[in-house]
């Protein structure tokens, strides 16, 4: 299902990562959360491809579909 995402307990403490790199899916998500654009991410990390970034986002979306979600309180 996910050709670009790999998992190995001996790499990055078992976090899912982009195959052929040592960049975790979590790290890629944090880049976007901090405001980076896709073009900025691809320019800064040339080992990533458009396909690998898209797959990381899809992997994350699939992961939270089946996860327990925590309550988030919003301050007004």
Question: How should these model regions be labeled?
Answer:
Residues 50-74:
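C-terminal structural segments of small proteins and small subunits
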Residues 3, 73-76:
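Short hydrophobic/aromatic patches at helix-to-coil boundaries
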Residues 24-54:
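Amphipathic, hydrophobic secondary-structure cores in small proteins
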Residues 2-17:
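Short, Lys/Arg-enriched N-terminal segment that forms or immediately precedes the first helix
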């Amino acid at each position: 299902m996910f050709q670009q995402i790999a998992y190995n307990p001996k790499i990055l403490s078992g976090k899912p990562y982009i195959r052929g790199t040592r960049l975790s899916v979590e790290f890629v998500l944090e880049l976007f959360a901090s405001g980076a654009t896709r073009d900025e991410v691809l320019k800064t990390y040339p080992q990533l491809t458009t396909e690998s970034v898209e797959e990381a986002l899809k992997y994350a979306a699939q992961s939270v579909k089946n996860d327990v979600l925590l309550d988030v309180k919003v301050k007004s």
